[in-house]
Amino acid sequence: MTAVRDRVGDKMKLMTDPASSLPSFMAAVEVGRACDDLGFFWYEDPYRDASSSASAHKRLRDFIKTPMLIAEHIRGFEQKADFVLMGGTDILHIDPELDGGITGTMKLAHFCDAVGMEVQLHTAGPMHRHCMSAIPNTHFYELGLVNPDRVWNGLQPPIYTDDYGDSVGDVGADGCVPVPTGPGLGVTYDWDKINAWETAAVVFE
């Protein structure tokens, strides 16, 4: 963390995501205080409870100053609303693929806006772009698992026949990505590629 801050200086916002891997509460405090010292923008899902305990994260917030981004692993409107009302986070993680689709995601975003809280959309995709374009209380579009040597998002493989993509090269010079404008989600899926990669199928009737 210190090496990254030294490399980029103050020209970039930095965040860290231990992915619920820190072994104890005190380890989470230690990393959180390092975030404080280095001016991190947020501190995400630190320790091994998988961000499931609102009371534990409320207590952790008392020990550090860096805003916490929690609730990637909690599903649904009611559970996430409880987490917010119990003081378990500073920023709420939401995801249209996991939180009741676009409708559930927008409900959570509006709820948080009403109580003065910001949200962060988890990962990327056409739904995420549409939601983000309609949410005022959010900051960043997440292209996860990319780096200069891995240019496409490992969570969002290239499965489109149009110019949509979630790779490093799809980010504009201004740091933004466009919102698809076609019918539905605005993208055209490459079903030949999707079917070629299929490993199993289940039909619900």
Regions inferred by a protein language model and the residue ranges of each:
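Structural signal for hydrophobic packing residues in well-ordered secondary-structure cores
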Residues: 5-8, 132-136, 198-201
